[in-house]
């Protein structure tokens, strides 16, 4: 797949692997929609049946208004569109953007709102509303959950999440994303303090236990 990383994010996740994309006025270069379309079309022969273009970031919906025309052009070109989003931004542009997408990767950082705020500095209320909109509008999506010890690895929260989403028909799969520190060098380069330096990586036992928890509520669960 062709992956486009976009500048700007509304969340402040403590484990963010791309801190350089948070600031809307970051150092990324401005790219014309036509240029991205050209790249996608040129790579289309290599996409096969499962390929396409994925928009990540940062937070893609942060630039929803500018992306809508590009999404329309990509649809006309027959290119599969995937959006990786935290679901925390909502307006008419975001609504149209997600309507045009073929698949949404919805990152639910934590189900407990207070713990979500501790992890991201934002509420998860809109994320849950976005999930409900995807379900109501029959938009396929993957639910993704980063497993962070002391922050998002609580049995009661995962069970509450499962109870909330267990009857959603549009969730094609659940992905458990192990916590990693691959972006720490970026914090060092940007002279920023990485606040989770004392948090340990997940053990295989923890990942297996989390997978079993999610499988109580969802048919298809992967650890990625």
Predicted regions, residues:
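Canonical Radical SAM [4Fe-4S] cluster-binding loop centered on the CxxxCxxC motif
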Residues: 1-31
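Conserved alpha-helical substructure of the radical SAM core
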Residues: 19-53
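Short glycine-enriched, charge-decorated loop/helix-capping segments at active-site entrances
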Residues: 20-26, 117-123, 191-199
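Conserved AdoMet/S-adenosylmethionine-binding subsite of the radical SAM
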Residues: 41-45, 49-52, 57, 61-182, ...
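C-terminal accessory region of radical SAM enzymes
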Residues: 140, 205-224
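A structural motif corresponding to the C-terminal lobe/cap of the Radical SAM core domain
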Residues: 163-166, 172, 188-213
């Amino acid at each position: 797949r062709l992956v486009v990383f976009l500048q700007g994010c509304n969340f402040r996740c403590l484990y963010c692997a791309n801190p350089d994309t948070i600031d809307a006025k970051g150092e990324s270069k401005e790219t014309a929609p036509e240029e991205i379309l050209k790249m996608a079309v040129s790579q289309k022969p290599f996409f096969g049946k499962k390929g396409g273009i994925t928009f990540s970031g940062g937070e893609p919906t942060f630039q929803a208004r500018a992306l809508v025309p590009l999404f329309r052009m990509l649809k006309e070109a027959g290119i599969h569109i995937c959006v990786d989003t935290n679901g925390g931004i909502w307006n008419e542009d975001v609504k149209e953007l997600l309507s045009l997408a073929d698949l949404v990767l919805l990152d639910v950082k934590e189900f407990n709102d207070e713990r979500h705020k501790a992890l991201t500095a934002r509420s998860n209320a809109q994320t849950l509303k976005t999930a409900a909109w995807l379900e109501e509008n029959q938009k396929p999506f993957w639910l993704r959950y980063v497993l962070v010890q002391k922050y998002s690895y609580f049995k009661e929260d995962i069970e509450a999440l499962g109870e909330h989403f267990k009857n959603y028909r549009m969730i094609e799969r659940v992905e458990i994303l192990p916590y990693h520190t691959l972006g720490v060098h970026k914090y060092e380069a940007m002279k920023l303090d990485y606040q989770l330096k004392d948090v340990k990586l997940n053990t295989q036992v923890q990942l297996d236990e989390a997978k079993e928890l999610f499988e109580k509520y969802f048919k298809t669960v992967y650890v990625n």
